[in-house]
Amino acid sequence: MVDIIKTNATFKAGKGNKGTLSFEIPAKQISSGIDQAFNKQKDKINIPGFRKGHVSKELFLARFGEEALYEDALNAILPDIYDQAVNEADITVVGQPQIIPDDLKHGGPSKIHAEVTLAPTVELGDYKGVEVEKESDEVSDKELNAELERLQKGEAELVPAKEDQVSEKGDTVVIDFDGSVDGKQFDGGKAQNFSLSLGSGQFIPGFEDQLVGHKAGDDVDVKVTFPKDYQAKNLAGKEAVFAVTIHELKKLETPALDNEFAKDVDDSVLVLEELKAKTKEKLAKDKAEKNKDAFEDAAIQKVVDGAKINPEKLPEEMINDDVSRQMQTFFNNLAGQGVKPEMYFQIPNQPGAVKATNDRRRTNRVKTNLVLEEIARVEKINPSNEEIDKEIKSLASEYNIKESEVEKSVSAGMLSHDLKVQQAVELIVNSAQAVEKK
């Protein structure tokens, strides 16, 4: 039978959503903590005349005093006792507490004060059967034709232009160019037989535009001004002239939409109508998946928007916790690819593990989590040990790591929380009513 720890917890409200949680650590737990702390340190203890790891606790205490073990003892026993104190005080906290121990006393209970931040309260609106607009999954002729056109462009080939044809955006020109500023050439301003797709934005603004409307064999003086923030400081903001010779003009030639094209695109079909049918089927599947995701997101957002959260300004601790969860997910994804965090940070020019998002998106994500947690509480959603074990197996398989590694990197409490939120989402989505989008 598990002993129930009584902490005599009390909570005193402070300014805003801050406050002080005061509680006691019973003597029995202090004694247990000191034992754990000694066992942790004993292999490192070095006393003349004794081998490492063979010093008794009594000798250690006589030599160094209990105080030498207090920090490790507190670290060992505090998490569970703090959680019990929070439950006794009937409060919901966010972030990490700032612990202020009075002092540890082996023979009696020790008083602890913790500066804590209270979680905002949530007043739910409707969350079952909410009506949400949903796009039709039907594929229109316009959408099908656009996809067929995209497939045609994918099979297009560059062919030499006819003599009377002029260059347009999307065409490719093969050019020589020689640039100068104030009549003087500059490094990197000259090339021969350079292949340039007009409209690609490879060159500074204005350069490609001035090559539109010309034929192969034309000589063109292109006049441009380098941007003020141009990487070469000696050219930034300066006017330049490029002497350009167009050697070749090539245009994209798209194949005809016929049976031969259909067989080139998909060797499992024989005629164009088969390709159209398969393409339409794929578009419908993709559209249905996209609409499903949008419908679910809209249903959840409607529930979040219908809830009242007090205070409206979320504690910074909640934002920080959210960022930590994102980082955990990010590094779990890396682990699934065989990349350790230290390996990632050694790669040059890598972005941060969690890209910065604007305050509104961050706040909405935390609000969503609060609302889902409240729904889970009201609906008494409590994942079973079997469900948690199943999730551990699923994560191990997804990230290609051992189950023991999942258990090390993600606590059972975090897994339980994620499953609660997931089941709250399912409750909202499964009961939501789809209405035709106007």
Curated annotation (Swiss-Prot):
It is found in: Cytoplasm. Its main location: cytoplasm. PROSITE patterns: FKBP_PPIASE (PS50059). InterPro entries: PPIase_dom_sf (IPR046357), PPIase_FKBP_dom (IPR001179), Trig_fac (IPR005215), Trigger_fac_C (IPR008880), Trigger_fac_C_sf (IPR037041), Trigger_fac_ribosome-bd_bac (IPR008881), Trigger_fac_ribosome-bd_sf (IPR036611), Trigger_fact/SurA_dom_sf (IPR027304). One of its GO terms (cellular component) is cytoplasm. Its EC number is 5.2.1.8. It comes from the Bacteria. Residues 170-255 form the PPIase FKBP-type domain. It holds the Pfam family FKBP_C. It catalyses: [protein]-peptidylproline (omega=180) = [protein]-peptidylproline (omega=0). GO terms for molecular function: peptidyl-prolyl cis-trans isomerase activity; protein folding chaperone; ribosome binding. Keywords: Cell cycle, Cell division, Chaperone, Cytoplasm, Isomerase, Rotamase. GO terms for biological process: 'de novo' cotranslational protein folding; cell division; chaperone-mediated protein folding; protein transport; protein unfolding. HAMAP family: Trigger_factor_Tig. Involved in protein export. Acts as a chaperone by maintaining the newly synthesized protein in an open conformation. Functions as a peptidyl-prolyl cis-trans isomerase. Consists of 3 domains; the N-terminus binds the ribosome, the middle domain has PPIase activity, while the C-terminus has intrinsic chaperone activity on its own. Belongs to the FKBP-type PPIase family. Tig subfamily. This is Trigger factor.
